[in-house]
Curated annotation (Swiss-Prot):
NCBIfam families: PRK05396.1, tdh. The record marks 148 as: Important for catalytic activity for the proton relay mechanism but does not participate directly in the coordination of zinc atom. Its cofactor is Zn(2+). Its EC number is 1.1.1.103. Pathway: Amino-acid degradation; L-threonine degradation via oxydo-reductase pathway; glycine from L-threonine: step 1/2. This is L-threonine 3-dehydrogenase. Belongs to the zinc-containing alcohol dehydrogenase family. The lineage of its organism: Bacteria, Pseudomonadati, Pseudomonadota, Gammaproteobacteria, Aeromonadales. It is an enzyme of class 1 (oxidoreductase). Homotetramer. It is found in: Cytoplasm. Its main location: cytoplasm. Zn(2+) 2 binds at residues 93, 96, 99, 107. Binds 2 Zn(2+) ions per subunit.
Amino acid sequence: MKALSKLKAEVGIWMTDVPAPELGHNDLLIKIRKTAICGTDMHIYNWDEWAQKTIPVPMVVGHEYVGEVVAVGQEVRGFAVGDRVSGEGHITCGHCRNCRAGRTHLCRNTIGVGVNRPGSFAEYLVIPAFNAFKLPDNIPDELAAIFDPFGNAVHTALSFDLVGEDVLITGAGPIGIMAAAVCRHVGARHVVITDVNEYRLELARKMGATRAVNVSKEKLADVMSALGMTEGFDVGLEMSGVPSAFQDMIDKMNHGGKIAMLGIPPSTMAIDWNKVIFKGLFIKGIYGREMFETWYKMASLIQSGLDLTPIITHHFHIDDFQQGFEAMGSGKSGKVILSWDK
């Protein structure tokens, strides 16, 4: 079958011909319809330090997808050939303390689809049936293909009560932008998102951000004043991994504020812990999606009218994958969809 693989320990990704995956007793075989390029895929493409330490070569990559079930393992219940599915990209062990307690998103033995095992940039994918999510008919393929990153946004944004709250989001990548849309949809008062990329700040405006602030040109304190804010933000969503952005967030949080962190900062990042302590801030780390509460919430948000379509800015056939990666790497894109349909 055709598949995009990391074949060499260098920059790039290659179209290859690999054997189709084998179906296990508890697995689904999925024929891929559409995939999306993730920031993780860009790390793998660019072969940065994280990728060099993490990705075995060769490896079929990709983990954002939608497809159709074409075969079902003999022990599987609840799925049938013809079902349209997306899937959770974190394969969990099922026997650690967190898995047994129903907190599978915190499994210490997680294996990543397209990272530690063959991924979805292929004609066919095998995953455990436990990881598949059957899609409602009224959610189109292109939205289903981005459920993985949308789930990151939903998990982060819905970590805290948002109704009537003032929210600061640092980092206007696709996940940060989708988080802004979620915050507005569920009833936040002001949703302010910061970045230095004008293209993506404009996308954030289209997706409902109250203010999209280029912090290289405008002071966040001035924006807060213009919005009539006098006490700081109630909720912070850190999506950038940029130390200066996180420090700015801590400075602008109200006393008792709550921060959810999805962005990955340098391990040596220093912050003013005095402000964390004396403001009584709550900081929560976010990894992946809650299984499967986040997935149910994603479907419900879209079915209740949340419009994610502006975040999808580019479509390519899989044969033109190189153009897709170039678009994603340009900084002038939202989500990039690769279609596997003939």
